[in-house]
Amino acid sequence: MLPINNNFSLPQNSFYNTISGTYADYFSAWDKWEKQALPGEERDEAVSRLKECLINNSDELRLDRLNLSSLPDNLPAQITLLNVSYNQLTNLPELPVTLKKLYSASNKLSELPVLPPALESLQVQHNELENLPALPDSLLTMNISYNEIVSLPSLPLALKNLRATRNFLTELPAFSEGNNPVVREYFFDRNQISHIPESILNLRNECSIHISDNPLSSHALQALQRLTSSPDYHGPRIYFSMSDGQQNTLHRPLADAVTAWFPENKQSDVSQIWHAFEHEEHANTFSAFLDRLSDTVSARNTSGFREQVAAWLEKLSASAELRQQSFAVAADATESCEDRVALTWNNLRKTLLVHQASEGLFDNDTGALLSLGREMFRLEILEDIARDKVRTLHFVDEIEVYLAFQTMLAEKLQLSTAVKEMRFYGVSGVTANDLRTAEAMVRSREENEFTDWFSLWGPWHAVLKRTEADRWALAEEQKYEMLENEYPQRVADRLKASGLSGDADAEREAGAQVMRETEQQIYRQLTDEVLALRLSENGSQLHHS
């Protein structure tokens, strides 16, 4: 940092000639502001940066993370970027007309000053804003998430990206597009929006609107689904959810939520065990998840479901690692609709089985381990298929798409971890033809890719380390010999062939590819060897439908 000196000799150029008369005024005002610092404020550091910015004619001023409660009224007039995020600011002074980027996230702002006419980026998330001033026509990106905003001003035609998640918006702004070629992505998730204006259809089909977790009426949902399903539809892609946006944030004690799944004669002992986990990370959201799980169609209609959940909870109580993993998986499950809870339950059952495999449950049952691996492989392929399907839909709840493929193909693909019923299949956009195509694709890819996938699967490696220590050690030795002797030349050859020699990013990518190919070769050879031995002993088969 340059030394600050009030006797600094100003160069003879146009800028400094302009400010020479006010140079002392800036310093005097800033020094006075510094002396008014509250305990904990780093105003001395802020003033040092202000003076350096002025002396150097810098176009950027960064005063973030200094615990400031206010800013001086006279900011350097030449700046184009101002970063004052992560302070304690309740208001901002008049902003320089030259400003193009304003970062003031995570403060306590209740209002904003008049915005500069050339502003391009406004980042004021995590404040206490209730409204916004008029937005300049130049604005390209804006993040106002996590505020208390009830309505929005007119949106500039230039605006490409808007994030307004978690506010109190009751309606969307009017959308006008015309011949404007801008590709837009707007996020209005988790507000209080109950209807969608017809002007949303003015947006181009390359645009995306996110309105998940809002109390949209069933009439609004049906109307949108009807419009966006039309062959003539050319409007934006709309991401929604079947959630009403009104999930209860209250939760009961974890032990109470757990014991509700057990018979009365076991509840006292179970409660005592789970009381010890009340303060673990995500315990509160896990409690809420268990209560929501009890209200799913699977819980109501599936025989033995309560016993299945109770047995799973017993396993969680006995393993801190599994419990930690499961709490994390369930962390966001209650922020959306019932089918989000059902999909999370699927993922929790996968987590349990993979954990058990890694811990040795299938060390002596290779056939069962192969069956589990095959199920995990099929689920991965279904996720790929669901992801591709989402891209084709104009009005989409992603949760419903992912769950639809798992639920509707659970029996045909022998998916033991998938629920057999879901509530909102009708809005998923997944057709009978989609399901037939997905089943065929899963079986085709399984036939051609499963053994390679299985040879790289973490739980299989854990089994090999425990039960085939000598073979595993030999495979590791072969891998590192190959990497030491062949890796550099193979990477160099790949870069030369693509004309990217000397490109650091390309070298990293090529290195990762060579590493994966090496591991694939070594571990596939080891897998074939071990499976041939084990499957011949017990009569199991590697391939089956």
Swiss-Prot record:
Top enzyme class = transferase
Region annotation (Linker) ranges = 243-250
Name of a matching Pfam family: LRR_TTSS
Cysteines joined through disulfide linkages: none
- Superkingdom of origin: Bacteria
Would you kindly state one Gene Ontology biological process term found in this protein's UniProt entry? protein K27-linked ubiquitination
| Record-annotated NEL domain positions | 253-545
Q: Which InterPro entries match?
A: LRR-bact_E3_ubiq_ligases (IPR051071), LRR_dom_sf (IPR032675), LRR_E3_ligase_N (IPR032674), NEL_dom (IPR029487)
Record's keyword terms, sorted: Host cytoplasm, Host nucleus, Leucine-rich repeat, Plasmid, Repeat, Secreted, Transferase, Ubl conjugation, Ubl conjugation pathway, Virulence
Q: Where is this region: Interaction with target proteins?
A: 1-242
How is the quaternary structure described? Also interacts with human and mouse U2AF1 (U2AF35).
Domains (record comment): The LRR (leucine-rich repeat) repeats are involved in substrate recognition with target proteins.
Question: Which protein family is it in?
Answer: Belongs to the LRR-containing bacterial E3 ligase family.
Entry protein name? E3 ubiquitin-protein ligase ipaH9.8
Organism for this UniProt entry:
Shigella boydii serotype 4 (strain Sb227)
Upper classification of the source organism reads: Bacteria, Pseudomonadati, Pseudomonadota, Gammaproteobacteria, Enterobacterales
